[in-house]
Amino acid sequence: MSEGPVYAQPSPGEATQRALVTVVFLRMLARPNRPATILPPGVSVTPERLDVAAYRALYNGVGGPWLWWLRRLMPDAQLEKHLANATTSISLLRVDGEVAGFFELDAAYWPFVNLNYFGLLPKFVGRGLGRLFLDYAVDEVFKGASSLRGMSVNTCNADHPRALPNYLAAGFEEYRRGRETWDIPTRLGFVIPEKVRG
């Protein structure tokens, strides 16, 4: 059976594809000792409230190559409530005015903030933006309240191969890893990479 929220459980008899993934959990308990991130000309990051359709388009565009599937199954009403929650914040990366990626922060477990999602649209991958954008996200979290105790994120071996090295280089430290079984509905159209195919 697939691990995760109730809405992610396949319906009885539904065709699924199985992925066996290694999930790595990381955290950062203090801001890295480095200068604040400076965005180059033409690059901007802005916090925004997205509606369900805009969020789904961005989530699917960024996460499609990397098996981001859970939010695809989240009911619209539940996703709308999540996006409107005061503990949820989403910031968009733009390059010359064009949306290039996003990150989603979740402060529901304050004094810890989780980086729920982070990534770039495919056409912007490989242009040196990922680390810059990640450093900016870290700065945004740690510039706030003094009661903050840390920031967390997780990744897996279905993600971009640079994801884990980038998190480690940004100052996150691994504290746990585990194996998960994902039964992903075939109707979502994913091609399961050989390395995680169950």
Where are these regions (language model features)?
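Conserved beta-strand-loop-alpha-helix junction that forms the acyl-donor binding cleft
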Residues: 125, 152-163, 180-189
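Short acidic/polar active-site loop segments enriched in Thr and Asp
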Residues: 89, 149, 173
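Conserved catalytic-core motifs of GNAT/GCN5-like acyltransferases
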Residues: 21-26, 173-189
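Short amphipathic alpha-helix that is part of the acyltransferase structural core
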Residues: 39-70, 193, 198
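Conserved GNAT acetyl-CoA-binding A-motif
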Residues: 142-155
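A conserved beta-strand-loop-helix scaffold within acyl/acetyltransferase catalytic domains
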Residues: 70-77, 83-122
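Acyl-donor-binding surface of acyltransferase catalytic domains
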Residues: 1-43
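Conserved acetyl-CoA-binding loop-helix of GNAT-fold acetyltransferases
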Residues: 120, 126-143, 165-169
